[in-house]
């Protein structure tokens, strides 16, 4: 029986088809993780494991959760965050906290919210709070968005949002490479229906009005489009955080400086191998590796230390054996982050399912990335939602925990935040905008178009699309994703479920807890190879 990508789910194997394989459930995984790592001294001496040093507890709680669940406080929050002429009160509250020049009228008006900030900001000094929150445009936008969301929908795990926290904007279809796995199926020329500069600037204005704190520019290759600089400058005017995902081949020192002046502080450059020939063959152009590595050096040499680069690698069967070398290269090139991209068979990668990792390979990879994150040698990002589960299970209480699209942070409070914003954010806390203005839940779900920015507001598109309720409800899942102990922190990759089963609510067959479903795919489709679980144990 053939099971092409996007077709219906394969029938279950008959019990006598193959020897029974030992599968792992999330409950067993959690129990095993609790006693996973004793330090070397305790292990050597045989000293008992102290429960205060536990590594996993999926029921973290913070007093702020009680406040946010109170209907009276939600009403107060709604009043603070409501949009009005001059902007929401909450924006003014955040921007004026700790300001010695604040008028007595404003001191009285904002006494209660300022008191709450003092109560919940912990050991952060007033000056530090002003620098990192009140005077940081993206944080203010994000907090207003979150406050409006809690006021409207209540506190929910995962949290529903009135507007996306992140927009990934595939700025143009044009690209100068021909990557074998391109999710966008990018071309060497622009498409005739791409947004005009006027439409692009208007879209930024609308995103700011909806309190969208971050826009990530991708493509195609966004740096080929001359409209990118004026659009970046408009984002900077509104306080929107911007990043550029690029192949790096155009990023000369002069271009890096121009984008940095326009407000970009993070560049994410794709590099698939430490072997130049291997990378160039995959990317379809000789010399690509050399130019990308030089671009990473150009960014590292920029005089502003806040301008940084991440090395992004899509890990497949073709470069799984290079993971350690890629990490070392990222560190040697002074990157601030190593970014793992989950392989998803869409776009030009649609016929490459045999290159996908097995669940056990992916689990090994994520555990290795967690170890790297805890070492703090370099930041770690992953588009695999299972990374949040891995951090929760194998990081110490004060260790780094991934909150999916929002990065990672340390400590118990980070685990509370991850409960609400962690895991797959497709169509829930982030959305994709295509070069022509079409909107989809995720860059890896290009066929799930739910509207166009030329016709409707961002809020209407985001909350009114046919996938929103489904993607916000993790009880509506198939396979182990429905009952998983970690579903608040993961939820499975909806794009992978959609690519393999044609169903955004399907199980993610790349997860260790759905390994039986992966085995069924392998057995049902000869195209999906079953490679050895190299280094995956």
Describe each region flagged by the PLM.
Residues 87-258, 262, 266, 357-358:
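Conserved alpha-helical substructure of the radical SAM core
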Residues 184-193, 446-451, 487-521:
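Iron-sulfur (Fe-S) cluster-binding segments and ferredoxin-like electron-carrier domains
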Residues 203-219, 472-473, 508-537:
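Short Fe-S-cluster ligation motifs
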Residues 2-165, 536-537:
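Flexible, acidic/Gly-rich N-terminal and inter-domain linker regions that tether
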Residues 424-428:
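Short, small/polar residue-rich loop motifs at catalytic or cofactor-binding pockets
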Residues 197-358:
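Radical SAM/AdoMet-radical enzyme domain recognition
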Residues 2, 302, 359-415, 438-491, ...:
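C-terminal accessory region of radical SAM enzymes
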């Amino acid at each position: 029986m053939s099971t092409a990508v996007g077709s219906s789910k394969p029938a279950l194997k008959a019990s006598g088809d193959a020897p029974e394989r030992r599968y792992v459930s999330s409950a067993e995984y959690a129990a095993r993780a609790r006693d996973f790592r004793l330090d070397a001294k305790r292990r050597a001496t045989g000293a008992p494991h102290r429960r205060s040093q536990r590594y996993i507890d999926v029921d973290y709680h913070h007093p702020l959760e009680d406040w946010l669940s109170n209907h009276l406080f939600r009403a107060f929050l709604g009043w603070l965050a409501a949009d009005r002429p001059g902007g929401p009160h909450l924006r003014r509250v955040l921007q004026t906290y700790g300001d010695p020049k604040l008028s007595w009228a404003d001191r009285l008006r904002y006494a209660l919210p300022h008191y709450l900030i003092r109560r919940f900001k912990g050991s952060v000094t007033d000056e530090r709070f002003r620098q990192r929150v009140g005077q940081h445009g993206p944080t203010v936008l994000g907090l207003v968005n979150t406050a409006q969301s809690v006021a409207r929908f209540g506190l929910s795990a995962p949290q529903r949002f009135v507007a996306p926290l992140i927009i990934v904007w595939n700025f143009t279809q044009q690209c100068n490479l021909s990557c074998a796995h391109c999710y966008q199926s990018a071309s060497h020329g622009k498409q005739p229906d791409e947004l005009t500069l006027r439409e692009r600037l208007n879209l930024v204005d609308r995103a700011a009005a909806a309190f969208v704190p971050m826009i990530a520019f991708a493509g195609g290759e966004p740096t080929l489009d001359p409209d990118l600089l004026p659009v970046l400058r408009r984002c900077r005017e509104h306080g929107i955080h911007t990043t550029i995902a690029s192949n790096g081949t155009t990023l000369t020192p002069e271009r890096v400086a121009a984008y940095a002046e326009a407000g970009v502080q993070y560049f994410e450059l794709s590099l698939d191998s430490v072997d130049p020939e291997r990378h160039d063959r995959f990317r379809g152009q000789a010399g690509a590796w050399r130019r990308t590595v030089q671009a990473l050096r150009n960014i590292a040499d920029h005089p502003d230390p806040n301008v940084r680069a991440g090395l992004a690698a899509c890990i497949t069967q073709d470069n799984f054996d290079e993971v350690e070398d890629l990490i070392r290269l990222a560190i040697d090139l002074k990157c601030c982050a190593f970014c793992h991209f989950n392989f998803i068979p869409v776009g030009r990668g649609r016929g490459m399912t045999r290159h996908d990792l097995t669940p056990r390979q992916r689990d090994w990879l994520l555990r290795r990335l967690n170890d790297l994150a805890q070492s703090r040698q370099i930041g770690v990002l992953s588009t695999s939602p299972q990374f949040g589960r891995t951090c929760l299970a194998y990081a110490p209480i004060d260790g780094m925990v991934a909150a999916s699209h929002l990065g990672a942070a340390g400590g118990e409070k980070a685990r509370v935040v991850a409960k609400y914003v962690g895991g797959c954010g497709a169509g829930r806390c982030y959305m994709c905008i295509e070069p022509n203005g079409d909107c989809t839940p995720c860059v890896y779900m290009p066929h799930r178009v739910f509207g166009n920015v030329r016709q409707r507001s961002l809020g209407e598109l985001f909350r009114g699309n046919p996938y929103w309720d489904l993607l916000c409800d993790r009880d509506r899942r198939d396979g182990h994703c429905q009952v998983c102990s970690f579903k608040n922190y993961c939820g499975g990759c909806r794009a992978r479920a959609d690519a393999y089963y044609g169903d955004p609510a399907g199980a993610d067959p790349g997860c260790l807890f759905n390994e039986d479903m992966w085995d069924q795919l392998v057995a049902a489709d000869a195209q999906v190879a079953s490679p050895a679980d190299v280094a995956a144990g």
